[in-house]
A protein has these predicted regions:
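Polar low-complexity intrinsically disordered regions enriched in Ser/Thr and small residues
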Residues: 15-18, 92, 126-127, 162
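Positively charged n-region of N-terminal signal peptides that target proteins for export
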Residues: 1-5
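Mature extracytoplasmic domains of secretory-pathway proteins
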Residues: 56-126
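N-terminal export/targeting and maturation segments
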Residues: 8-9, 14-88
Length: 169
């Protein structure tokens, strides 16, 4: 009987810690706004057609107007905020993700574990982000590794393009 009480106490403490962490992130999200990162991203990458094929895009050099340490990319529209939070510790802001096109991705910048910008919608009908998304359809990349090349998608007959992560040696 003592073991059962002990187990319940452990689960209770873990539950309280998880709830406190969730509430802390929820409070941090309330201060998310349009930022210079959003403006810089839109200026550099939208519309997608203005990107040059076979060109490298180093996010740490392009997006230097404010501090950030990770970029978080989520594939639309199948976004489960709770599942992503449990897996990654990143709480996505409330947004109508379901009504987004399947060809869209949402880009977020993270600083000290908190998202610091509103969702940036990125993609198009002939764009595919080909970068080992996990089962939750997200990709989390540290700033120093956020280096991409814009190129034609190799396995496509339809002229699809991709922003492919350049693997660091």
């Amino acid at each position: 009987m003592k073991n059962i009480k002990y187990i319940f106490r452990i689960f209770g403490v873990i539950g309280i810690i998880m709830i406190a962490s969730f509430l802390n992130k929820k409070i941090q999200l309330s201060s998310v706004s349009e930022s210079c990162l959003t403006e810089s991203f839109n200026k550099e990458f939208i519309p997608l057609e203005k990107l040059n094929l076979n060109t490298e895009y180093n996010f740490s050099k392009i997006f230097n107007c404010t501090e950030w340490d990770e970029v978080f990319i989520v594939q639309a529209p199948y976004i489960n905020r709770a599942f992503i939070y449990i897996q990654s510790g990143v709480l996505l802001p409330e947004y109508d993700y379901i009504n987004s096109s399947e060809n869209n991705h949402f880009v977020f910048f993270i600083n000290n574990g908190h998202i610091i910008n509103k969702p940036i919608i990125f993609g198009g009908p002939y764009f595919l982000f080909s970068n080992n998304f996990n089962r939750s359809n997200y990709l989390k990349i540290e700033k120093e590794n956020a280096n991409f090349i814009y190129k034609k998608y190799e396995d496509s007959y339809y002229g699809m393009v991709t922003l492919e992560l350049i693997e660091n040696d």
